[in-house]
Amino acid sequence: MARHLFTSESVTEGHPDKICDQISDSILDALLEKDPQSRVACETTVTTGLVLVAGEISTSAYVDIPKLVRETVREIGYTRAKYGFDCDTCAVITSIDEQSGDIAMGVDEGLESKTGEEIEEEIEKVGAGDQGIMFGFACNETPELMPLPISLAHKLSRRLTEVRKTGLVDYLRPDGKTQVTVEYEGSKAVRVHTVLISAQHCETVSNDKIREDLINHVIKEVIPAELLDEETKIYINPTGRFVIGGPQGDTGLTGRKIIIDTYGGYSRHGGGAFSGKDPTKVDRSAAYAARYVAKNIVAAGLADKCEIELAYAIGIARPLSIFIDTFGTGKVSEEKLVELVNKHFDLRPGAIIRDLDLRKPLYKKVAAYGHFGRTDIDLPWERTDKVEQLRKDALGE
C-alpha cells in the first residue's frame, strides 16, 4: 500500500501571535462575564515593549483592558525585561470604537424575520454577523477524533510550556514551536517520521543539554513509543540558537494561526480567525458548530472521516449551503448525511449560540493549543450527544 507523509505544526502560548489571541479572548471573556450580549471584535498586536488593542465593541460592561493585558502576559510568563518583553513595563495602547450600526442591524434581526418568514422564539432574529464559509472536520485517527499530526504537535507544545512553568526545564523561555510529520500507509498512521521543536532558552545553556532534556522530558513523554523508531528524525533548535524570541523577535497579531487553531492543514479552512470575536460572528460560532456536526457523524460510526462546509450571508440566519465530504469512508451517502444534519442540528447563529452555550466566558482557554480535540477542558462543541439519534436514523439501530 502506498505511503505518504503529512505534517502539522503548533506553537506555545508564548508565541507572539498566540499572545495576541489570548489577550483578545481574555478581553472577550471579561466582557461576556459582565454582559453576555456583548458584541466584540477585538484585535491585538504586540511588538518589542508594546501592546496595541483595537477593535469594535458594543457592551454595557466596563473592563480594564490594560490590566487584562498585563495579567495575560504575566500568566504566559513574560515577567522580566531580560525576556525581551515584560508585563509590568510594556506600553499598552487601546483604540476601541462601537460596532458598526450597519452590521448590528443585520445581526439584531435577521432578514427572514424582517420579511415575515418563520420565527421560532427569537432565534430567527439573529442573523449571521458576516458572510463567509466555515469548515468542520473529524476523523477516527485519535480518541479525540482529530488528525494525529496536529494532535501530537499540540501535545508537544503544551508539554513544552508545562516543563517550563513547573521548573523541570528551568532555562526555557515562553516562546516555542513544534512540528510533527506522520507517515501513513494508505489512510493509517504507522509511525512518526520527524519531530521538530524550536524552544526559546536562556543564553548560557548548551545545545546538547537542550536536546537531551527536550527528548527525554517532552518528546518521549508525549509521543507513543510505538510511533518512534531508530529512523525517526528529531530536530531541536536547528538554527543552533533561540535566545531572542517572543514580541522582541517577531511582531504578533491576532488571528494569524488559523491552521494551528483548527486541524493543522488536514482539512480545508474558510479563512476566518476565531479569537477576539463574540459568537454572533459565524467565523467562530459556525466553525465550532461544524466541528460539532462532523465529530458526531464520525463518533456515530457513519464515516471514518467527515468534513462539512457551511456558508452564510450577513443578516440571514439560515446557512446558504451545507456540503459534506466523507472521502469515500461513509457508511451512508453524503446526501443522506446532509439530510440528517438538517434534521438534527440547528445551524442558525442564534441556535448555535443557544445549543452550544456560547455566551459564556470560555474562549481564553482555547486561545492556545487548539480549539478542537481538547481533552483537558469540557467544550460544548466536543460533545457527542447526537450519536444515538444519528445512528438510529441513518442505520435503523
From Swiss-Prot:
Listed Pfam families: S-AdoMet_synt_C, S-AdoMet_synt_M, S-AdoMet_synt_N
The GO molecular function terms of this record are: ATP binding; magnesium ion binding; methionine adenosyltransferase activity
- The protein in question is named S-adenosylmethionine synthase
As for family, the record states:
Belongs to the AdoMet synthase family.
Q: What is the lineage of its organism?
A: Bacteria, Bacillati, Bacillota, Clostridia, Peptostreptococcales
Q: What EC identifiers does the entry list?
A: 2.5.1.6
Q: Which organism is it from?
A: Clostridioides difficile (strain 630) (Peptoclostridium difficile)
The cofactor(s) it depends on are: Mg(2+); K(+)
Summarize the subunit comment.
Homotetramer; dimer of dimers.
